[in-house]
Amino acid sequence: MQKATYYDNSGLFGGYTYPKPDSYNYGPAHQSYPTSNIDSDYQGSVCPIQTAAVRPPALKDSDLNGDCMRQSSSQNNNNNQATSISEQQAPPLSASSPSSNSSASQKKKSPSSSASSSATPALTKQIFPWMKETRQNSKQKNSNNCATAGSDHDGGEVSDEKSPPGPASKRVKTAYTSAQLVELEKEFHFNRYLCRPRRVEMANLLNLTERQIKIWFQNRRMKYKKDQKSKGLAHSPLGHSPDRSPPLSGPNHIGYSGQLQNVNSLSYDAPSPPSFAKPQQNMYGLAAYTAPLGGCIPQQKRYPGSEYEHHGMQSNGSFANANLQSSPVYVGGNFVDSMPASGPMFNLGHLPHPSSTSVDYSCAAQIPGNHHHGPCDPHPTYTDLTSHQASQGRIQEAPKLTHL
């Protein structure tokens, strides 16, 4: 068995001869052992690790075989551990030069059990304390640290609130008392944004933290904005609002504005008669009927040779006549209208004008000199109106018409 064990390991001892079991003669006593044989021939053995560095001059055959037997038996049990140790220890041992016999004998006498026992703690030392921590525990610790830091330094302000320790800790909702809410609402009524000195003062007054007051004001401002938006949508007009209608320029003036200016390009500044009992209602309703005048463009008629466009106001009754097609006509350059409930015709030409240039008609100069209104035959002629005005005794000379 000793021979078989030695012959199995004879590849490691290539330079030695083995003549007889009872003789102790070896070939060359000292021979440099190449390191390539360690790596290529047999890497898993512990014997070349201990014998390659120093070659002893003479050893007993029984000691040598006994060491190899014990190491080969331990190698079968701890093959993986010995391989890892040999790979770790081979470079420094192979690079070292031959030393004294005492160090070699100490290496020889160390049993394989000590080598195997040293291999186990070497592997156990690789497990560090940080490897024992699981990811879940580290996440919980990090979340607790972040929550604490966030509660301490939120918005650049320091507060004494800290999240309670625990894996699933949640911030407790602050319950404000009625007295605190009243004071906060009062402060919000005067100032929607608090400065820091005032916030510190209120925190001391209400026994709250600055952070709580700051968050309450943020939430209250958002609520205020939502309320304003809801109110704005509720009160938004669907049609023309009263303030959008053109206002009257004065109690004695009528202005065609807005849509009529875009269509007709006319501006009338005719003063209303002071003899009206209800001047606001008898000003022909021009301010109130601005939108209907713009909407009844298909009913309009056109004077030949002029840009004046009149509208048949059948719905409002301001310009209605017996033939339902009446419209304002020109009487010597004056603006004449027929009232729905009154028989006499009101001629605005008899009223005193501030100046003859205050009444501007852009289309009057284009009307022919005979004052004949082409398609407007149903209306009374110029002579009829002048005779009707003569019966009233309020005839005045018509102002001279000029271009704008």
Curated annotation (Swiss-Prot):
> What cellular component terms from Gene Ontology apply here?
nucleus
Query: For this protein, what is any one GO molecular function term?
Result: RNA polymerase II cis-regulatory region sequence-specific DNA binding
Q: Per the record, where are the segments of Low complexity compositional bias?
A: 71-122
Q: Which family does it belong to?
A: Belongs to the Antp homeobox family.
* Annotated motif Antp-type hexapeptide, positions: 127-132
Gene behind the chain? hoxd3a
Q: Which residues form a coiled coil?
A: none
Which subcellular locations apply to this protein? Nucleus
**Known function:** Sequence-specific transcription factor which is part of a developmental regulatory system that provides cells with specific positional identities on the anterior-posterior axis.
Q: According to the UniProt record, which residues make up the DNA-binding region? A: 169-228
| Ranges of biased composition (kind: Polar residues) | 32-43, 137-148, 383-394
Give the record's keywords alphabetically.
Developmental protein, DNA-binding, Homeobox, Nucleus, Transcription, Transcription regulation
SUPFAM superfamilies per UniProt: Homeodomain-like
CDD domains reported for this sequence: homeodomain (cd00086)
Q: Where is the composition biased (Basic and acidic residues)?
A: 151-163
Among InterPro entries, the record links this protein to: DUF4074 (IPR025281), HD (IPR001356), HD_metazoa (IPR020479), Homeobox_Antennapedia_CS (IPR001827), Homeobox_CS (IPR017970), Homeodomain-like_sf (IPR009057)
Q: Taxonomic classification, please? A: Eukaryota, Metazoa, Chordata, Craniata, Vertebrata
Q: Chief location of this protein?
A: nucleus
Q: Where is this region: Disordered?
A: 1-122, 134-173, 227-256, 372-404
Give a GO biological-process term.
anterior/posterior pattern specification
Is Cell cycle a UniProt keyword of this protein? no
Source organism per UniProt = Haplochromis burtoni
Q: What's this protein's name?
A: Homeobox protein Hox-D3
